[in-house]
């Protein structure tokens, strides 16, 4: 009998393969054909275009085990995960599909036969729901399959509108739709709950295990239901639910996959209570996090990356709650790969990347988690009422990186609500402040709405004879532009490239007889192109013909930098891994800047490998080929689409040999050899999970290398060495400096000891206690600690306060022998003195330090020590 999750997966796919279905691999968790979806959340997602008639496959029957994530957006199960028996962020959906092949009778028969004959589920434990008016399905279930009428349940429009029902599926407001049949399993009367359609249906006794959707209508905009010419079938069965039934347990968290993950988590953290809900949360979250990273999503502050970050941080918080002191989450990946079997092949290939990304994110969050929890705990302990205010929510989010749902999770455990509306208000205020701070002047051009279209000829031409079709001055449409005025000129066609995809807009000239307009920038305004600049001489009018001339040198240098970003992107993916994806770029004539997803600093050896790889491709002198094609065709060819970019149905594909293929509308060199040379100038992090490389090409790269060589030569001269020996000579000098610093420190200690011998005699006695207060002008502040220690040893039982002023700053130290700390505390004493010199400080009862900014008040401040001590000793 099939019992393990892996056995069930294999049995399902084999059953449908034996019945003429094509086994199709699970698609990525990042949807490639549906921009409306955050994550793949159903088996039919990858077949959406097939159902819509926009795509054709070489098969009409398919079966899959699809990885799915529901966290964020419309389908968000995150809040319930760990607290219920069946909510997950990650799950596998078993499914079979018919694209105009079989319909209701076969779909029903396939499902029933698999459940009752292959899995041998008791028929009396199964009941079926159908849409209220779907008599065809009712007859098939009762007459063909033999389900008793008492186990058939009709469900009507129970969601407030026509065809708004649990048993009527719709892709959207219009398009394919149809009734569905759901098969439920009865876990037994020892569990509370009622059959579907009853008031107790939300209980856990009757659990839906299989949904069979009959796509038989095409819903029109006016609501009319027209029959589809080729009805189709979409089914889904959660593998975790059927595994629970086959393994004789009620909760999904008791099945083999979760039992092993929970046990491993408990072992790593050192927990003995395996029923703890935090273990369930962690076991669920490692699945979604690991598979999302394997599919190219990296933790970030936006979009899919932010949802991933929220899930990781929720898991880390629950680990902290269980007592985890060190990074633990990433250590679950090997166990996950083991328990997922064939479903983890892609995860196994990216295991190292997944573990590094999880560890980096966990360690980063751990640094602020403890402090944030202290703030939250304090706020909850002092809370008046049962709702945490929005300002505190915002502070935790803004300062400590606590997603709102993580804070809500903590509050939920204490039966406390959260003021999400107040949080959103605080967020809105911050956005307004940021916008106001950045708004140094009105940008009228950004507000332009231009009802015109400009054709682009700049891929092949840098000159043209366009006509003026619109003029704007100070954001307003005008008929004429006069000399000296700044303006936006709109042409019917142009060789000027408008800023897009990270490439800056072209510069150049628009001229005619007696007319010179200097183009300082070129921008898009919808389908129109605006040439921004100043009219140097003459007059511009609508309808006027001009000569457009792009600055050839600037365009050429920009093209070098744009083409090399494609090579850089491909090289980074080869050296660092396929998880690397572009997050932003800037390409101008001087340099290029490339932002990309990666979880740690790039090692010098990796940077060198990337640079060498790019220069190798430059030397190979690949021809740059461009082609227009359908976006789906481009993706099939392996073209990289940049996340966040919007593409038309027809796209431009730029290919460089067999090394790089990307969707790109920018301008490029003819061959990679034109780039000449590529040199990385810097690499650094700009956000969690996002790195930035800056680089130069061509003549700029040669100039950079010459500049570096000049600095090396100068350093060699200073070290009286040749360039090749600079590192060795510099290391020797640094070693010498370290030794001198050590000698100096020892000398200071000796001087402090000698000085302490002289000063010890200056101590006064107050109520039987020795007190020494000294202002030491000119002494190095770093020597105060050693001097104070020496004086303590000599005076044995004493109170010591030393102060020095240097470079406009005051440094103070107070020392109290241990036998006196119950009466006089060094921290309180030094804080009292510091407040009189414009500073503050504190420390332990026996030793404390402080600083100040008013050296002119130091003597008077030290004079206050004796009466202060006298008061505490009396």
Swiss-Prot record:
GO cellular component: cytosol
Gene Ontology process terms (BP): alanyl-tRNA aminoacylation; negative regulation of DNA-templated transcription
Top class in the EC scheme: ligase
UniProt cofactor(s): Zn(2+)
Gene Ontology MF terms: alanine-tRNA ligase activity; aminoacyl-tRNA deacylase activity; ATP binding; tRNA binding; zinc ion binding
Positions annotated to bind Zn(2+): 562, 566, 664, 668
Keyword Membrane belongs to the record: no
Enzyme Commission number, as recorded: 6.1.1.7
Locations listed in the record: Cytoplasm
Chief subcellular location: cytoplasm
Annotated catalysed reactions: tRNA(Ala) + L-alanine + ATP = L-alanyl-tRNA(Ala) + AMP + diphosphate
Sorted UniProt keywords: Aminoacyl-tRNA synthetase, ATP-binding, Cytoplasm, Ligase, Metal-binding, Nucleotide-binding, Protein biosynthesis, RNA-binding, tRNA-binding, Zinc
Description of its domains: Consists of three domains; the N-terminal catalytic domain, the editing domain and the C-terminal C-Ala domain. The editing domain removes incorrectly charged amino acids, while the C-Ala domain, along with tRNA(Ala), serves as a bridge to cooperatively bring together the editing and aminoacylation centers thus stimulating deacylation of misacylated tRNAs.
Function summary: Catalyzes the attachment of alanine to tRNA(Ala) in a two-step reaction: alanine is first activated by ATP to form Ala-AMP and then transferred to the acceptor end of tRNA(Ala). Also edits incorrectly charged Ser-tRNA(Ala) and Gly-tRNA(Ala) via its editing domain.
Family of this protein: Belongs to the class-II aminoacyl-tRNA synthetase family.
Protein name: Alanine--tRNA ligase
Originating species: Shewanella frigidimarina (strain NCIMB 400)
């Amino acid at each position: 009998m099939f019992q393990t999750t892996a056995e069930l997966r294999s049995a399902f796919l084999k059953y449908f393969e034996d019945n003429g279905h094509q086994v199709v691999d699970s698609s990525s968790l990042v949807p490639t054909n549906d921009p409306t979806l955050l994550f793949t959340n159903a088996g039919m997602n990858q077949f959406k275009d097939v159902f819509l008639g926009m795509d054709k496959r070489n098969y009409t029957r398919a079966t899959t085990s699809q990885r799915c994530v529901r966290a964020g957006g419309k389908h968000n199960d995150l809040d319930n995960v760990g607290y219920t028996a069946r909510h997950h962020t990650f799950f596998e959906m078993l499914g079979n599909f018919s694209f105009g092949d079989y319909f209701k009778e076969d779909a029903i028969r396939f499902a029933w036969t698999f459940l009752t004959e292959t899995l041998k589920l008791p028929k009396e434990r199964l009941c079926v729901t159908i849409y209220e008016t779907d008599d065809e399905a009712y007859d098939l279930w009762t007459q063909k399959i033999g389900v008793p009428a008492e186990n058939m349940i009709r469900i009507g429009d129970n969601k407030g509108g026509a065809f708004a029902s649990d048993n009527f599926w719709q892709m959207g407001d219009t398009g394919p739709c149809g009734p569905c049949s759901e098969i439920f399993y009865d876990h037994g009367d020892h569990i509370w709950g009622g059959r579907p359609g009853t008031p107790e249906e939300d209980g856990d006794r009757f659990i839906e295990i299989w949904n069979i959707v009959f796509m038989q209508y095409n819903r029109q905009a006016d609501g009319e239901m027209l029959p589809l010419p080729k009805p189709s079938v979409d089914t889904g069965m959660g593998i975790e639910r059927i595994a629970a039934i086959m393994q004789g347990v009620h909760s999904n968290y008791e099945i083999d996959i979760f039992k092993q993950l929970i046990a491993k988590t408990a072992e790593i953290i050192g927990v003995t209570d395996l029923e703890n809900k935090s273990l369930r949360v962690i076991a669920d979250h490692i699945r979604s996090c690991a598979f999302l990273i394997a599919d190219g999503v990296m933790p970030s502050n936006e979009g899919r990356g932010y949802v991933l970050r929220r899930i990781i941080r929720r898991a880390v918080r629950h680990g902290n709650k269980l007592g985890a002191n060190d990074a633990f989450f990433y250590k679950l990946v090997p166990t996950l790969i083991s328990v997922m079997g064939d479903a983890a092949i892609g995860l196994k290939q990216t295991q190292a990347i997944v573990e590094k990304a999880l560890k980096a994110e966990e360690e980063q969050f751990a640094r602020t988690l403890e402090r944030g929890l202290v703030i939250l705990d304090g706020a909850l302990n002092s809370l008046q009422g049962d709702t945490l205010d929005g300002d505190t929510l915002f502070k935790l989010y803004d300062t400590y990186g606590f997603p709102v749902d993580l804070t809500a999770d903590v509050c939920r455990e204490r039966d406390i609500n959260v003021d999400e509306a107040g949080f959103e208000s605080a967020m809105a205020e911050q956005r307004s402040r940021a916008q106001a701070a950045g708004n140094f002047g009105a940008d009228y051009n950004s507000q332009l709405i231009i009802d015109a279209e400009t054709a682009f000829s700049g891929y092949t031409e840098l000159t043209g004879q366009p006509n003026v079709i619109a003029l704007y001055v100070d954001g307003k449409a005008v008929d004429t532009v006069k000399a000296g005025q700044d303006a936006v000129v709109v042409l019917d066609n142009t060789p000027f490239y408008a800023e897009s995809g990270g490439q800056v807009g072209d510069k150049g000239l628009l001229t005619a007889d007696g007319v010179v307009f200097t183009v300082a920038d070129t921008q898009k305004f919808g389908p129109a192109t605006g040439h921004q600049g100043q009219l140097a001489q003459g007059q511009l009018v609508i309808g006027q013909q001009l000569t457009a001339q792009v600055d050839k040198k600037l365009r050429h240098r920009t093209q070098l930098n744009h083409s090399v970003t494609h090579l850089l992107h491909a090289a980074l993916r080869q050296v660092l891994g396929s998880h690397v994806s572009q997050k932003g770029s800037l390409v101008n004539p001087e340099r290029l800047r490339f932002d990309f997803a990666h979880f740690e600093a790039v090692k010098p050896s990796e940077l060198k490998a990337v640079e060498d790889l790019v220069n190798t491709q430059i030397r190979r002198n690949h021809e740059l080929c461009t082609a227009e094609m359908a976006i789906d065709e481009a993706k099939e060819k392996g073209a990289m689409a940049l996340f966040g970019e919007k593409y038309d149905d027809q796209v431009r594909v730029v290919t460089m040999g067999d090394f790089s293929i990307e969707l790109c509308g920018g301008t490029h060199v003819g061959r990679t050899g034109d780039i000449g040379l590529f040199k990385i100038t810097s690499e650094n992090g700009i956000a969690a999970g996002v790195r930035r490389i800056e680089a130069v090409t061509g003549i700029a790269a040669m100039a950079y290398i010459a500049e570096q060589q000049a600095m090396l030569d100068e350093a060699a001269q200073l070290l009286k060495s040749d360039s090749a020996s600079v590192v060795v000579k510099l290391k020797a000098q640094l070693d010498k400096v370290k030794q001198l610093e050590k000698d100096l420190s020892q000398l200071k200690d000796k001087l402090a000891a000698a000085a302490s011998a002289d000063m010890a005699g200056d101590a006064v006695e107050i109520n039987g206690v020795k007190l020494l207060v000294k202002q030491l002008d000119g002494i190095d502040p770093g020597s105060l600690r050693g001097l104070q220690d020496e004086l303590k040893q000599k005076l044995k039982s004493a109170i010591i306060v030393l102060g020095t002023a240097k470079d406009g700053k005051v440094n103070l130290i107070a020392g109290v022998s241990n036998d006196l700390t119950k009466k006089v505390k060094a921290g309180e004493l030094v804080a009292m003195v510091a407040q009189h010199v414009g500073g503050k400080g504190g420390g332990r009862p026996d030793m404390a330090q402080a600083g100040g900014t008013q050296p002119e008040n130091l003597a008077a401040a030290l004079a206050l020590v004796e009466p202060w001590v006298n008061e505490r000793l009396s």
